């Protein structure tokens, strides 16, 4: 009986301890949320100079090269949008946490769109543009649009007055990703082909761009087709251009190498079907570029890692195509670029001409302010008007 009583007491103690631990974790999460919210609120209040604001939303990263790129983006926006305050957020909580821990370089604080939008609302901005720094409209863009922005407009946290929400009606807009439409893919192709380093590389051999892409089942807006369209516009200029991705079916590195060898492919993307014929390309030299806003883990590992047998760098070289992902001695340039931001080949947002394309989307979004194309708040939704 004493043994049973002891075991029962031990079980109660264990459950109690677990309950206290769970409560402690909840308290810590709540405390951290409030702490980060106060930090963002203080920044917004201190830096507010206007009643209009642009919040740029990137997925995030933990590399210095990417951090430097984000600074260039923000600086460009501040220079090109006078009268607007500009802030940057990460949509990836994992990137935010890893950046704070200093995963690859010195620790750095970034915050998610929820904290920024809370602070922006509390600062009573009158016009708000949320600009996506994604390349195509996919899973991350959906998260920004249908979670962060929607929750803000619906006053999820209950921190805004009805009067303020009414004032936001038709005064909040979302800037679309780099290749939201087919015409954007054509514009990007023209810009990339004019970049001096790309133009020189494609004149000497293959230029292969590596995008991210949406895996099967996650191509919410049919954005994957933009990679195929971009490639076709590039190849209309020079057949040494190729475009592939990390996650999109039919465009993985094996597929790109088969295209280089020569074949006909029927791309099936959503409701769109495209037959594309690739002539055999006998070039023995290739240059790889990240087709992403920044060069982070995917560019570092999936594209350029010489020690990874499955990286684009390794597989291209194994196919007897002398391939570089950086201009100088590969491994040294790669590591240097990622840790101190020098000695690398740029990703999309590092190119001034490409940043202008994103800013064009922001201007298009601004033009929608005050119109039926802007977002409405629940206080003025059609069924309540």
Regions found by a protein language model. Give the residues of each.
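Bacterial N-terminal signal peptides that target proteins for export
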Residues: 1-9
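Hydrophobic helical h-region of N-terminal Sec-dependent signal peptides
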Residues: 9-17
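Active-site-proximal alpha-helix that buttresses catalytic centers in soluble enzyme cores
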Residues: 24-385
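C-terminal motif of bacterial Sec signal peptides marking the signal peptidase cleavage site
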Residues: 18-22
